[in-house]
Every structure is written in C-alpha cells, then in structure tokens.
C-alpha cells in the first residue's frame, strides 16, 4: 500500500549528525540516503601531509561503510554518487588559486554552493525524484529564509551564506533545534553505530591534513625573508609565504628576538612575509572592508540592524553596509583584528542569515592596508 508521505533525500556522510537527521526525518517522510564521494587522494596527488595515504582502506570508504550500516539500521535505501572531478573543478582549483595569490579562502562555503546544494541536489531531484533534500547542518529554515541554529556553538549558517533563495527553497535541517549532546543522546538511544564517532575536521571532504605539507602537493615551497614591518629589518626566513595566515603566531620559528611576533601581511610577488611584535597589535586593525560576489538569499531585512561575522566562530560585529554596483559591498565596523582577504563576510539581521560576500580589501580610517 502506497503512503502519502513526501520523500526526502538525506546526505548521509557516515557521521553522527547526518545519521540522526535521517532518523528524525523517518517519522514524517519517506527517507532515502545519498552518500557523496568528493575526494580521491591518489587521483588528486594528495600524498604530503596525508597521514592516511598508506592505510588499506581510505577514510572516505570507511565513512561509506558507516553510512551503509546506518541505512541498514534505519531500514532506508542508500545510493552513492561521485563528484571527485566536480569538487576539484569548482572548489579545489579556487582554493589553490586563492592561496597562490596570498589569500585565505573558505572551501566549505564553495563546497556547499557548488556541490552539496547544487550537484547533490540536482541528482536528488532529477534522479531520485525527491520532494526535499536534507543535511546534518546546524541551521534553521523559517518561511523559506535561513536562520542560525538553536545551538549557537555549532551553528553553521556562516557556511551556507552563499546559497541562493532557490537553493534553500526545498531544504530541511532536522537538527535545527538540537544541541550536539542531544544528538549524541538520540544516537545512543537508537543504538546507531555512529553515536560515539568523532566529528570530522579539516578541509571540507578532504579531512585532517598537516596543512603546510598538504599545500606543498600543489604549490611548491619557496623560501624567503621575514621582515619586521616596524623597521623593515629581516628577522627570519619562511618556508613559503602561501603557508602563513594573517594573525598567525605559532610556527614562525623566529627565536632569538626580544619578543614574539605575529604575521601581519605578505607580499607574494616579492615572496616576503611581514611580521610585527606582539606589543604592536595595530597592524592587524581595520574598520572597513570592500567585498565582492555578494549573495543575498532574501530582500527581507532591516539595513539598520545588520551585524556580520568575518570568520567562523567569531562574535558578531555591528556593521553598516553600503551596497555598490556589480555585487560589491563596502562594510564599516568598529575596529576589528585580523580580517583577511579571501575569507567570507557573512551578514545577519538578528538571527536571520541574509547572505555573504568575499573580502577583497581592508581599510583603516579609509586608508587601504597594502601589506595585506
């Protein structure tokens, strides 16, 4: 006998969040699991910095085995789709290109925009004929608009900021009102095999890597000088300016100096890293920025009530936003530190996430910071 329930395709990753998302949806929907494979270490020359390259079974296949077991436990069908080439073309090439320019990109945001909520969604709607898609993201949908999750510590709306209104239209976030502890409790109560599985970390779909080594697979290491920006004196040598981020304090290997340093800028063309003494924090300070590629997922917001995050897990800053032509925005804020070109500025109206843009230039009192 056919039921009248709508169908939802859940992105089953083999982790506890997507497992519980699938379990919760079973109460009201016909649930189909879909596992994505987006990275192949052998095809993608992922050797340096990869602790698992010599394992008999790669982490993605172990995750797939867990997803298969969850599907069996929940009695739902599971399909598998391969986006290795597309992930490289749409996400990873941009990631490497940005690092080559000395910028710090956010691959998770592009992965959501081009893979999870585009290619994955199209496969679910066109091939599996679903009514909705769902993921284990910590985020909330209300009346077709994106909001922060109830668990503010885990909220992932920041990473969904480049999704269009159209992409969000048929998305369900079953974990929107739950904390991580509550999710693990549900998983234990249902004896799900992922109940105690540790959270995935590292680069979206690639995993944990020794980051500088990992980048050397794609960007050759080239040593250069480290300059103290306060006096232009050489204070050390770096192993490649692509491997350092603005605000970085650890791993600089600048021993023998009177005080510790932090990275405050870089000149990729000259292969120079600029550092400043910890007692001089002003080289990280700014109070406005220019951003490109603005994406707004709604026009329903109060321009006078906007706040922004300049990186994930950061407190909101109150902002004034000037909307310019060609999807550029100028953003004004009280003094903030270590805002970095290539990262995403994400806008909120209270709890509502209205979109985001890519940080291009940083200013202090309307003067562009050229050493970034």
Curated annotation (Swiss-Prot):
<comment type="function">
    <text>Catalyzes the 2-thiolation of uridine at the wobble position (U34) of tRNA, leading to the formation of s(2)U34.</text>
</comment>
<feature type="active site" description="Nucleophile">
    <location>
        <position position="111"/>
    </location>
</feature>
<feature type="binding site">
    <location>
        <position position="36"/>
    </location>
    <ligand>
        <name>ATP</name>
    </ligand>
</feature>
<feature type="binding site">
    <location>
        <position position="136"/>
    </location>
    <ligand>
        <name>ATP</name>
    </ligand>
</feature>
<dbReference type="InterPro" id="IPR046885">
    <property type="entry name" value="MnmA-like_C"/>
</dbReference>
<feature type="disulfide bond" description="Alternate">
    <location>
        <begin position="111"/>
        <end position="204"/>
    </location>
</feature>
<dbReference type="GO" id="GO:0002143">
    <property type="term" value="P:tRNA wobble position uridine thiolation"/>
</dbReference>
<feature type="active site" description="Cysteine persulfide intermediate">
    <location>
        <position position="204"/>
    </location>
</feature>
<dbReference type="InterPro" id="IPR046884">
    <property type="entry name" value="MnmA-like_central"/>
</dbReference>
<dbReference type="Pfam" id="PF03054">
    <property type="entry name" value="tRNA_Me_trans"/>
</dbReference>
<dbReference type="InterPro" id="IPR023382">
    <property type="entry name" value="MnmA-like_central_sf"/>
</dbReference>
<feature type="region of interest" description="Interaction with target base in tRNA">
    <location>
        <begin position="106"/>
        <end position="108"/>
    </location>
</feature>
<keyword id="KW-0808">Transferase</keyword>
<dbReference type="InterPro" id="IPR014729">
    <property type="entry name" value="Rossmann-like_a/b/a_fold"/>
</dbReference>
<comment type="similarity">
    <text>Belongs to the MnmA/TRMU family.</text>
</comment>
<keyword id="KW-1015">Disulfide bond</keyword>
<feature type="region of interest" description="Interaction with tRNA">
    <location>
        <begin position="154"/>
        <end position="156"/>
    </location>
</feature>
<dbReference type="GO" id="GO:0005524">
    <property type="term" value="F:ATP binding"/>
</dbReference>
<dbReference type="InterPro" id="IPR004506">
    <property type="entry name" value="MnmA-like"/>
</dbReference>
<keyword id="KW-0547">Nucleotide-binding</keyword>
<feature type="site" description="Interaction with tRNA">
    <location>
        <position position="137"/>
    </location>
</feature>
<dbReference type="Pfam" id="PF20259">
    <property type="entry name" value="tRNA_Me_trans_M"/>
</dbReference>
<protein>
    <recommendedName>
        <fullName>tRNA-specific 2-thiouridylase MnmA</fullName>
        <ecNumber>2.8.1.13</ecNumber>
    </recommendedName>
</protein>
<feature type="binding site">
    <location>
        <begin position="11"/>
        <end position="18"/>
    </location>
    <ligand>
        <name>ATP</name>
    </ligand>
</feature>
<feature type="region of interest" description="Interaction with tRNA">
    <location>
        <begin position="311"/>
        <end position="312"/>
    </location>
</feature>
<keyword id="KW-0694">RNA-binding</keyword>
<dbReference type="GO" id="GO:0103016">
    <property type="term" value="F:tRNA-uridine 2-sulfurtransferase activity"/>
</dbReference>
<dbReference type="GO" id="GO:0000049">
    <property type="term" value="F:tRNA binding"/>
</dbReference>
<keyword id="KW-0819">tRNA processing</keyword>
<keyword id="KW-0820">tRNA-binding</keyword>
<dbReference type="GO" id="GO:0005737">
    <property type="term" value="C:cytoplasm"/>
</dbReference>
<dbReference type="Pfam" id="PF20258">
    <property type="entry name" value="tRNA_Me_trans_C"/>
</dbReference>
<feature type="site" description="Interaction with tRNA">
    <location>
        <position position="343"/>
    </location>
</feature>
<keyword id="KW-0067">ATP-binding</keyword>
<keyword id="KW-0963">Cytoplasm</keyword>
């Amino acid at each position: 006998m056919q039921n009248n329930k709508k169908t939802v395709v859940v992105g089953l990753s083999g982790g506890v969040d997507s497992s519980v998302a699938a379990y919760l949806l079973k109460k009201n929907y016909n649930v189909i699991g879909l596992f994505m494979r987006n990275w192949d270490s052998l095809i993608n020359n992922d050797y340096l910095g990869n602790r698992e390259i010599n394992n008999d079974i790669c982490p993605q296949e172990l995750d797939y085995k867990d997803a298969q077991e969850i599907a069996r436990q929940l009695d739902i069908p599971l399909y598998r789709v391969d986006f290795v080439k597309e992930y490289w073309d749409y996400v990873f090439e941009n990631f490497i290109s940005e690092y080559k320019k000395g910028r710090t990109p956010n691959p998770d945001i592009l992965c959501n925009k081009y893979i999870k909520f585009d290619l994955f969604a199209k496969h679910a709607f066109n091939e599996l004929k679903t009514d909705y898609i769902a993921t284990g993201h910590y985020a909330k949908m209300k009346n077709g608009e994106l909001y922060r999750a109830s668990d503010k510590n885990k909220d992932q709306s920041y990473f969904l900021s480049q999704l269009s209104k159209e992409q969000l239209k048929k998305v369900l976030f079953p974990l929107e009102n739950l904390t991580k502890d509550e999710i693990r409790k549900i998983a234990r109560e249902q004896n799900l095999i992922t109940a105690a599985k540790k959270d995935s970390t590292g680069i979206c779909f690639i995993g944990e890597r020794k980051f500088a080594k990992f980048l050397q697979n794609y960007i050759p290491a080239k040593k250069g000088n480290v300059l103290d920006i306060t006096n232009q004196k050489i204070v050390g040598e770096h192993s490649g300016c692509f491997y350092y981020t603005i605000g970085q304090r650890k791993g600089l290997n600048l021993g023998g100096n009177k005080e510790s340093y932090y990275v405050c800028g870089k000149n990729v063309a000259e292969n120079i890293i600029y550092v400043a003494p910890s007692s001089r924090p002003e080289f990280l300070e700014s109070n406005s920025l220019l951003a490109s590629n603005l994406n707004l997922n709604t026009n329903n917001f109060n321009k006078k009530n906007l706040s922004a995050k300049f990186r994930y897990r950061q407190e909101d800053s109150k902002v004034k936003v000037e909307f310019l032509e060609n999807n550029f925005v100028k953003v004004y804020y009280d003094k903030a530190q270590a805002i970095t070109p290539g990262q995403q500025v994400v806008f909120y109206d209270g709890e509502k996430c209205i979109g985001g843009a890519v940080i291009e230039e940083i200013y202090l009192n309307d003067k562009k910071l050229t050493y970034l």
